[in-house]
Amino acid sequence: MSESTASPAPAPWLAPALKTLLNQRGHAWLLSGPSGLGQYTLALELARAWLCLQPSEEGACGHCASCRSIDLRTHADLRLLMPETQMLDKAWPLHEKAQKEIDEKDRKPSREIRVDAARDMVAFTQTTRSGGRHKVVMIYPAERMNHITANTILKTLEEPPGDTRFLLVSEAAHLLLPTLRSRCQTHTLSWPDAAPALQWLVSQGVAPTDAQVLLDAAGGRPEDAWAMAQSGLKASTWLALPKAVARGEALALQAWTPAQVVAVLQKICHDCQMLAVGAAPRFFPAPALPVGAPLAALTQWSKDLLSSARTAEHPFNAGLMLEALVSQARGALRAKH
């Protein structure tokens, strides 16, 4: 399914974290935690507050020239390092050279943080700020830097020129170089309770009849559940998937990209494995799942899906890959003891 380029309103469980971080010292912070908890949103609100001309204890004022320029993606003292695909999805402007290369079809937008962007960021920190209190560099997701890119920013991260502050935002902090982690203070986001997460989803326009199912589908990650709703996914569609896949109906998954299909099948496989050993499923209610597949077949299917995940971002033929994945799933789910 297509992904929305919009962003949800900051969730209420981020407010205490924002207030805590605003009262802390330090020029480099690592905001970590699983995806879908709001790391990107929290980091942007923290950057907004640091740059705000009239901040309060709760954060940015939201209406000064600095806040407005962040809304317009034009703040001269804020630099984002992100994969170009995510920069475009979130409506952040690319460097002029990178935009030209993409427009002229010289290359596709990068899914990693490019070393050229890191070098531009280092140069950005060495220029005079435009008139505010700080310069801010936000890196998201920080684990999308390879070793060369990470080493490019290392010295600047350790000894930033002037009053530059860094926000490294990660959904897989264990993948970061230890030398990066050691130069940052860390704040780890905690999981919100289900009740406020559901209330927030409904406040963001998710149908009450869909909210619980989509929150479960997202593994309890509220922003991921919101993104599912934004893509058009309904509870009824999600609940019908496992048995449709067991029947070999590739049509049920044709709206997803190959990478998304693999992720959905991994969730079905996980929950079927849980049922097979007498445990509770996580992503689907038990009645929605096919039963009877032997654990050995499910375990082999899980291994096959891990292998498929390595090529799902760049399949040779998306249609053929979908057919193969569904055929593989049908075979595992209909296997006999």
Description of each model-found segment:
Residues 1-49, 55-58, 65-66, 162-165, ...:
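Charged, glycine-rich active-site and insertion segments that engage polyanionic ligands
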Residues 147-150, 334:
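Short N-terminal helix/helix-N-cap motif within the alpha/beta-hydrolase-1
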